[in-house]
Curated annotation (Swiss-Prot):
Signal peptide: none
Gene this chain is encoded by: obg
Gene Ontology molecular functions: GTP binding; GTPase activity; magnesium ion binding
Name of the protein in question: GTPase Obg
GO biological process, one term: ribosome biogenesis
Classification lineage: Bacteria, Pseudomonadati, Pseudomonadota, Gammaproteobacteria, Enterobacterales
UniProt cross-references to HAMAP family, sorted A to Z: GTPase_Obg
Cofactor: Mg(2+)
Subunit structure: Monomer.
Record region (Disordered): 127-148, 362-392
Residues bound to GTP: 166-173, 191-195, 213-216, 283-286, 314-316
């Protein structure tokens, strides 16, 4: 299936149902009281994270999701049916952004996590709600409010423990093939990898970690050159970055300059990403003898000002790969994910209908004070309609 990590969708919540104006009519009861029911609330739109999905390709074709409208109230104090909710399933790791405000509404990082993205409209009130000691036959009702409407930008960010960095043809895909069951395409030309891929590295029956391979970076990637800039976001959730350096590039380029380009592109893209733990890994040491490889790696590290440990491996022959993987596993165990305590935001804001509609009446009263000719009555024959507003 084609990998798609960005999509734009429109979500529209259902409108609230209108209240009903009705009066009780039964035999021998010629003047029954009001019995108009309230409308139903509009349906909400939810996003739900699903670990069985790994792409947003479905939302390249289906772009609009609308919840059901609440039904109108009916006579005999019958409340309208609430509109049905709509649930949109997205892959785990999806970030949700409101295009209108640029606000990040949430990150879907756990299977089954739900996020409300459009709130349904509030129900309107039937005339029963307006009955009082001074207005026995109210003919007022309120209309349901419109539901939320939003354009959402969905961005899929892979959830991996380890991210692979490097120039094209540095051996990233060969490495992930060597340590996991993932089989990304490997060839002797640049940009063989066109989309990110994940591999699970199993050290034993109980220990494992996930590694992400993204297309190689080139100079100017932060400004849009090459393919890597589109996929750098997939490294934002990694705990450690493995910077693979081709110790003896076949094109004759300088490994030191190649490494500096990668570091520079990281810093241009995001300070947060550039500050992540990064390990230096020299690949393709099978192309020379051990002493020469060690001397060359040491010289490159010194030129980069690298004072920490570095690794010498050959992904093709798997020299040094096992040691590197165990060190990564140890680092992951010793540095568990620290989840920042997010502000406790209620998934659903609760409003009492009387608070909401009381505000409407207060606004109506304020307008009436400014305009003597203003009349809030929906029925011109109801002379007591306005009296309710002033004597509620």
């Amino acid at each position: 299936m084609k990998f798609v990590d960005e999509a734009t969708i429109l979500v529209v919540a259902g409108d609230g149902g209108n209240g009903c104006v009705s009066f009780r009519r039964e035999k021998y009861i010629p003047k029954g009281g009001p019995d108009g029911g309230d409308g139903g609330d509009g349906g909400d739109v939810w996003l739900e994270a699903d670990e069985n999905l790994n792409t947003l390709i479905d939302y390249r074709f289906e772009k609009s999701f609308r919840a059901e409208r609440g039904q109108n109230g009916q006579s005999r104090d019958c409340t309208g049916k609430r509109g049905k909710d709509v649930t949109v399933k997205v892959p785990v790791g999806t970030r949700v952004i409101d295009q209108g405000t640029g606000e990040t509404m949430g990150d879907m990082t756990k299977h089954g996590q739900r996020l409300m993205v459009a709130k349904g409209g509030w129900h309107g009130l039937g005339n029963t709600r307006f009955k009082s000691s001074v207005n026995r036959t109210p003919r007022q009702k309120t209309m349901g409010t419109p539901g939320d409407k939003r354009d959402l930008q969905l961005e899929l960010m892979l959830l991996a423990d380890v991210g692979m960095l490097g120039m094209p043809n540095a051996g990233k895909s060969t490495f992930i093939r060597a340590v996991s069951a993932a089989k990304p395409k490997v060839a002797d030309y640049p940009f063989t990898t066109l989309v990110p891929s994940l591999g699970v590295v199993r050290m034993d029956n109980e220990k494992s970690f996930v590694v992400a391979d993204i297309p190689g970076l080139i100079e100017g990637a932060a400004e849009g050159a090459g393919l890597g800039i589109r996929f750098l976001k997939h490294l934002e959730r990694c705990r450690v970055l493995l910077h693979l350096i081709d110790i003896d590039p076949i094109d004759g380029s300088d490994p030191v300059e190649n490494a500096r380009i990668i570091i520079g592109e990281l810093e241009k893209y995001s300070e947060k990403l550039a500050s992540k733990p990064r390990w230096l890994v020299f690949n393709k040491i099978d192309l020379m003898d051990k002493a020469e490889a060690e001397a060359k790696a040491k010289a490159i590290a010194e030129a980069l000002g690298w004072e920490e440990k570095f690794y010498l491996i050959s992904a093709a022959s798997q020299q040094g790969v096992k040691e590197l993987c165990w060190d990564v596993m140890t680092f992951i165990i010793e540095n568990p994910i620290v989840q920042a305590e997010e502000e406790q935001k209620p998934e659903k804001v609760e409003f009492m209908w009387d608070d909401y509609h009381r505000q409407q009446l207060e606004e109506a009263e304020a307008e009436a004070e400014d305009d003597e000719d203003w009349d809030d009555d929906w029925d011109e024959d109801d002379e007591e309609g306005v009296e309710f507003i002033y004597k509620r």
